[in-house]
Regions:
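Short, amphipathic alpha-helical "lid/cap" segments that border enzyme active or binding sites
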Residues: 427-438
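Short amphipathic alpha-helices in soluble, non-transmembrane regions
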Residues: 282-284, 375-382, 436-441
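Conserved N-terminal alpha-helix of the aminotransferase class I/II PLP-enzyme fold
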Residues: 1-137, 158-171, 186-187
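Conserved PLP-enzyme active-site core in the AAT-like
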Residues: 121, 125-335, 340
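Conserved aromatic
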Residues: 38, 132, 181-184, 368, ...
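Conserved small-domain helix->loop->beta segment predominantly found in fold-type I
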Residues: 1-62, 308, 324-395, 402-412
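FAD-binding core of FAD-dependent oxidoreductases
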Residues: 259-266, 301, 388-401
């Protein structure tokens, strides 16, 4: 761990961001206090409320540079302040921090170009795309848009989601009802509660991460329509090239950090409004105000993403082929206990929203018949390893251990094994990845 220089930016500060925080602390913080820099004033204000509500301590906000704002907190409150940074994704990017540290001036104007490229993949109107500094920032904004409409209602989360998508609903509103398995009588009961208008919104991922399960989206959408409940769908794992969820959802959230970027060198998020939603006008108004006109994404990050998107379609198509190949290989391997992939798990539900030209995606999860051997298999795996997904190179992650280390028993009770290994399959020759897996699985 001492040799680890960086990690996922919401969990581990990038060296440039560390330097930015240190500089701000030196310039504006009193003795015994620290400064955390946020990209804009409203984020700092929300973080301030979160810290003061959680710890009942005094904090203050100071203007910093180029619209950034610093939240000054006691040393004892730094952990809680960084919880806000992690959960909400309202973060300063490494490029934004670097620009400040080097006194660089960056002109804007790239957001419209990026939206044009994205609109070609989603089918939505240009002005119905709203850009954020991270995928979680987009989810958090969508959640606050829901609270703006229904301030006293809980939300409903269907299927086991990405860790912080659930944390946001647990910590920043009225609570959440969580149904991790949308098959059987419990799902039928949840649908009835949706039809009765009990919830402020229904959240789900298509497919879920890391179990790659797909909820029956047409059925949920119909129940939401009957009950007057907004439906928020995250299509990050599948991408808008493989599935069309906008026909059912009121809002679609997407982490552009993943497959859209494909390189792992930029963070960004997006919320897309369904123009046919009965709340389209309210959502547009809220999101436009929240993004200061349509985009909060730092200009240089925007430019990098535009460049990365050039081979988006070709890359996703290749990952679809490789993902299916790897999933089939693992499914037939004698040492593998179970494989999660949209082709194998809830396949009917996935087909309901799959595009004619779409595939099953490049994300695969699996366990071993002898789970305790997974550490040896992981150590022997000659592939890149890390916590993200959607890169053009194959990336292996001991997902549960990284995302749910402090709640392993809870995750396992929800069907997510602590020994689960998640593969984000890249564009390499499929046989190269299979060869690496075969050698590693010799240790199983």
């Amino acid at each position: 761990m001492k040799k680890l220089e960086a990690g996922y930016p919401r969990f581990f500060l990038h060296p440039f961001v560390k330097r930015l925080f240190a500089k701000a602390t030196e310039e504006i913080a009193e003795a015994g206090k620290r400064a955390i820099v946020f990209p804009h004033k409203r984020a700092a204000q929300r973080a301030q409320r979160y810290v003061e509500r959680t710890l009942a301590v005094a904090t203050r906000i100071a203007s910093y540079d180029n619209g950034m704002q610093a939240l000054v907190v006691p040393e004892s409150a730094i952990g809680v302040a960084m919880e806000y940074w992690r959960f909400t994704g309202e973060v300063v990017s490494s490029r934004q921090a670097q620009a400040h540290l080097s006194d660089s001036v960056v002109e804007g104007g790239s957001a419209v170009i990026l939206k044009q490229q994205l609109a070609e993949t989603t089918g939505a109107e240009l002005d119905d795309h709203f850009l954020y500094e991270s995928g979680m920032a987009g989810i958090f904004s969508a959640y606050r848009a829901i609270l703006n409409l229904f301030p006293s209602k809980k939300t409903l989360q269907l299927e086991f989601p990405y860790v912080d998508a659930l944390k946001v609903q647990e910590r920043f509103g009225n609570g959440v009802v969580f149904l991790y398995d949308t098959e059987g009588e419990d799902f039928d009961a949840a649908v009835r509660r949706i039809q009765e208008g009990e919830f402020g919104a229904v959240f789900c991922e298509i497919p879920s991460n890391p179990l790659l399960r797909t909820v029956n989206l047409p059925r949920v959408a119909e129940a939401c329509h009957q009950g007057g409940v907004p439906l928020v769908v995250d299509d990050t794992v599948a991408t808008s090239l493989n599935v069309d969820v906008l026909q059912f959802a009121d809002l679609v959230t997407t982490s552009l950090t993943k497959w859209v970027s494909g390189v792992g060198d930029v963070m960004a998020g997006m919320v897309t409004v369904n123009s046919q939603s009965q709340w389209a006008s309210e959502f547009r108004s809220f999101l436009k105000d929240d993004t200061n006109g349509g985009s909060r994404l730092y200009t240089e990050d925007c430019r990098v993403l535009i460049s990365n998107m050039k081979n988006f379609g070709e890359r996703v198509s290749r990952c679809n082929v490789n993902g299916e190949l790897i999933a089939e290989y693992l499914n037939a391997h004698p040492a593998v206990g179970r494989v999660w992939y949209p082709k194998f798990n809830t396949p009917h539900e996935y087909q309901l929203i799959r595009r004619d030209s779409g595939g099953y995606g490049g994300l695969v999860s699996f366990t071993l018949k002898q789970p305790r051997k997974m550490p040896k298999v992981y150590d022997a795996l000659e592939l890149c390893k890390g916590p993200s997904l959607g890169t053009e190179f194959t990336l292996a992650s001991p997902y549960t251990m990284l995302a749910h280390y402090y709640e392993l028993d809870w995750a396992e009770a929800c069907g997510v094994s602590p020994n689960l290994l998640r593969l984000s399959v890249g564009v390499e020759e499929g046989e190269v990845v299979i060869g690496a897996l075969a050698r590693a699985l010799d240790h199983a």
